[in-house]
Amino acid sequence: MNRGGLPSVQDNQPPSRQQSLSLFLLLSFFSFRLVLTPTMACKHTILQLNSSPFAELAGYEQPDAAARAAAETTSGRAPKSVKDRPIGTFPAPLVLPHDELNYDPDSSPQSAKEWLNEECRNKLSSAPRMNKLYVVQVPGISFKADFMRHWVVPSGYDEVKSEGKVGPSPPSADHFVDYLTAFYHDMPVRLFPTPLTWTSWGSNTKSAKGCRSAALPKYIGLSHGDHCTRIRVRPAPDTAFPAQLNLDDILDATISILPDDAYAMVLLVDHDIYESEDDDFCCGRAYGGSRVAVVQTARYNPILDERKGEEIDRSHMWPWSHCKTFVGELCAVEDVKATPATKKEKELSKGGAMKAATQAATAYKPTSSVQEVQALWFSRLARTVSHELGHCFALDHCVYYACNMQGTGSMKEDVRQPPYLCPVCEAKVAHAIAGELHGGREEEKRDWIKQRCEALRHFCKRLGDKDMDSSMWQGLNGWLQERMVAM
């Protein structure tokens, strides 16, 4: 699906969510182009904490403080004295031109009470079964399907592969296990124990090294043990990659191998994927009721940030995306005049968790261009992996705040969204894990939220030891530290 000339990202909840460095990421020759630390010409002095001026034109209105407070409770009733969450910690969705809420501003909010009563929700239980999260590492490639290695290389960059210039390998599945262990605190997270493998399907063993559709096999196989699932293949409509694999077929394979003790499982795929014939591509999708998700890595390749017409402003990824000057410039494209900073906006921009996040992100210095590319790739993927698993917890797209569970209309919007959960979505996960899985009551849920923040901070701090630190993780760590002061 195409929206406003931007590729769509699919998800398991309507509206769709749009969303790797390839195995042969060029770095030797192109390393000077991949230094991602932005030159901070913009100081991000004033923060955009309310929705943008464009939001009104789009028809989006953030639910008021009472509605947001009520949405956090499983009873659906707001506390007698409503204390609004500080906007400097939990800002509103930006709602910029071509964002998801631009196209679906009336998207129905899902309160904690509505989430609790979702028919498709799989309730967690303290019984020792169906209580684990699984991460399936990227499938290997058999000799018969060796031609598929070429498909993970962005079109136009194979000459670097032929010169033997190999960049960072894909992020290890272990990194995602560590992250999800913190993000879904107190849930056991495991690597799927047996590997999956891409292989040829039937007698179709074409070399398929070109981008021409005639050179592509119609199907390939995804094997696990003695079982093999047929996966459809097509050329990428935008030619970003030589080939795409069908998401629905991959999800069917994932469902068939779901362990008995799994609450949910996510499969990582290095190849570009699509869902329907109308899609340009699809980055992530979850079948929440079936408890499985698939996330591709290819479209998060930072090389694609420079594609004509789809350039990503690396100096305004989250948390810098809340820069008022940046927001004003994007609104001006739609003839929406930016408003001057008010006294209140100036005051709010001097402190708070979002200010701490922007300062921490700006202070980050990568150790090398290789490390920076690898870490950026992982940070982008981590957001989508946690988002898609959120749908397996029956969380719908969030419209209450800027939140990791927001829907996404483009890759540009994807990198502008936060890695944290808003109070409403966090309350749902707290009820599922601290309440249902561990039998806790309201006090235990509040304690769990604090412990989760600590776990995420610990994760962020340890990334430096693994050469996986980035501006997003530093920003999240700064945000968490400031948030916890008020807890």
Walk through the language-model features, giving the residues of each.
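Active-site-proximal segment of zinc-dependent metalloprotease catalytic domains
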Residues: 235, 239, 247-386, 392
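Metalloprotease/metallohydrolase-associated module, dominated by Zn2+-dependent proteases
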Residues: 320-380, 396-487
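Short coil/turn segments at secondary-structure boundaries
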Residues: 146-151, 278-281, 306-311, 397, ...
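Eukaryotic short linear interaction motifs
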Residues: 142-145, 273-276, 302-304, 412-414, ...
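N-terminal low-structure segments adjacent to metalloprotease catalytic domains
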Residues: 34-282, 436-487
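Low-complexity, intrinsically disordered or signal/transmembrane-proximal segments
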Residues: 10-13, 18-19
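Hydrophobic alpha-helical signal peptides and transmembrane signal-/tail-anchor segments
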Residues: 22-33
